[in-house]
Amino acid sequence: MKTYMTVLGAAAAFAPAIAQAGELNLICSADIVICEKIVESFEAGHDTDVNMVRLSSGEAYAKIRAEARNPQTDLWWAGSGDPHLQAANDGLTQPYESPRLAELHDWALAQAKTSDYRTVGVYAGVLGWGYNTEIFDKKGLGAPKCWADLLDPGLKGEIQIADPNSSGTAYTALATLVQLMGEEEAFDYLKKLGSNVSQYTKSGSAPVKSAARGEAGLGIVFMHDAVAQAEQGFPISVVAPCEGTGYEVGSMSIVDGAYNLDAAKEFYDWVLSPEAQNLMPEAGSYQIPSNKAAVASDKALKLEEVKLIDYDFAKYGETETRQHLLDRWSREIGSSG
């Protein structure tokens, strides 16, 4: 029976080893349950042992960058697309044109074309929040429908959002607000929001999990993560902000210098198939799959039902822009937390 490992935390690293035929070193930036489901299913149908580590998008980018001269990773699957685009921009990933590209939605193909085929879209998810209806009722708070509502003084200490340095979800939120409001107004908003934030988490999905457990009133997350908590029976209501919101194109990239390149391409092609993407709802995944023939869960949000901004993936995935926003956030928001 094949085995794989899951390791949590930015310090996790694959043990240096000589790559062997039939091995794949994989970083997974989806929820751990989804990571395990995908790896188990791939191993069941392929003669490949997968060594898997689960890292958030920001952590995955940092790991791949730190190991650029001696890559320990072959393939990075899932996580929001901006860090994947930055990795492509930095030459940390290599081009690959899968024979399945013609099967994908336009938004997934656009991710590939923007990066000169160094990354590709594997799913889409919309930014919003989930709030605990019991906490809101107990405090006499109205349902938060808009970004502006999150500045209500009654929400002091009730909001959680991740740190954009480690979380692709939170970076998407940061870039969304900048595109929606303009940079100066967005940072002014984030400073005011900080008065209501109890914690900047490492993981993008952690805020709504805290809200589900009653440890926070509201988590700013991708809406599919909030749907997952509601489907598990927690008192979570899911909201798409009225002013408009951004979205992610969860992506996949082959690391430049990947030792197990053939295995990486095999996984890459397989995970873009409708068969593989149809496995996602079984793991409680409510993202929108990138293969046009894949069937999304009936609980998944439809992009056409939400007011989306025209998210500029090329600009906000570009190294200079992304680093500027992260540095400013660290100086003005994170340091005051």
Residue ranges and their predicted role:
Residues 94-103, 119, 148, 218, ...:
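Short beta-strand->loop
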Residues 21-86:
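Early extracytoplasmic/lumenal segment of secretory-pathway proteins
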Residues 125, 189-194, 200-201, 232-256, ...:
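Periplasmic-binding protein-like
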Residues 255-313:
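Mature extracytoplasmic/periplasmic domains
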